[in-house]
Amino acid sequence: GFGTILKALAKIAGKVVKKLATKPGATYMLKENLK
């Protein structure tokens, strides 16, 4: 169902965020993407 898709996307997003968090400027990039 749709909920399963959202959970899968959340897991992927979490992994991406963790990878970006180790790089300088990641916070700035995330803020820009959320605008």
Curated annotation (Swiss-Prot):
It comes from the Eukaryota. GO terms for cellular component: extracellular region. Keywords: Amidation, Secreted, Toxin. The keyword Transmembrane does not apply. It is found in: Secreted. The modification Lysine amide is found at residue 35. GO terms for molecular function: toxin activity. Signal peptide: none annotated. The keyword Signal does not apply. Expressed by the venom gland. Belongs to the cationic peptide 04 (cupiennin) family. 02 subfamily. This is Cupiennin-2a.
